[in-house]
Amino acid sequence: MALLEVLTFPDDRLRTVAKPVEAVTPEIQKFVDDMIETMYDEEGIGLAATQVDFHQRIVVIDVSETRDEPMVLINPVITQKSGDDGIEEGCLSVPGAKGLVPRSAEVSVSALDRDGNEFSFDADDLLAICVQHELDHLDGKLFVDYLSPLKRKRIKEKLEKIKKFNAKNQ
């Protein structure tokens, strides 16, 4: 397995809309394993393929307390939404920033698993929010898009300063 580089805002590649996975091949399965390893290494609870510059509809999520129950969602689709929720969200692609994002409280999802088998599930609480957040990535959308233009600008400026600082000190 290998760690993948996570793209950071405002990288334009994060705005790419992911294409459906045509077939779950051994290469896709290896990539999924690398995504899971990267998600755990980055201490995230979810990761979309778009965030690692692979523009196919793949998401990995683990909201379990023990951090040992990864979910793989290939070609995920939210089939139903209900209720209103929202928490202060963060993102591996927007390090150090958080913002309140309106989300549905419950979602129903259909997807393929790591082996290409179809499955469906209902999610609420943190899992529902995480699914919506990660599927936004597949559509080229970031949580900062839900924030005010001023807050989004401040986050962008902060991350650009950090990037310049890191580039100078390497």
From Swiss-Prot:
The keyword Hydrolase applies. The active site is at E134. It catalyses: N-terminal N-formyl-L-methionyl-[peptide] + H2O = N-terminal L-methionyl-[peptide] + formate. GO terms for molecular function: metal ion binding; peptide deformylase activity. Its cofactor is Fe(2+). Binds 1 Fe(2+) ion. The keyword Lipid biosynthesis does not apply. CDD domains: Pep_deformylase. Fe cation binds at C91, H133, H137. GO terms for biological process: co-translational protein modification; translation. Keywords: Hydrolase, Iron, Metal-binding, Protein biosynthesis. SUPFAM superfamilies: Peptide deformylase (SSF56420). Its EC number is 3.5.1.88. Removes the formyl group from the N-terminal Met of newly synthesized proteins. Requires at least a dipeptide for an efficient rate of reaction. N-terminal L-methionine is a prerequisite for activity but the enzyme has broad specificity at other positions. Belongs to the polypeptide deformylase family. This is Peptide deformylase. It comes from Aliivibrio fischeri (strain ATCC 700601 / ES114) (Vibrio fischeri).
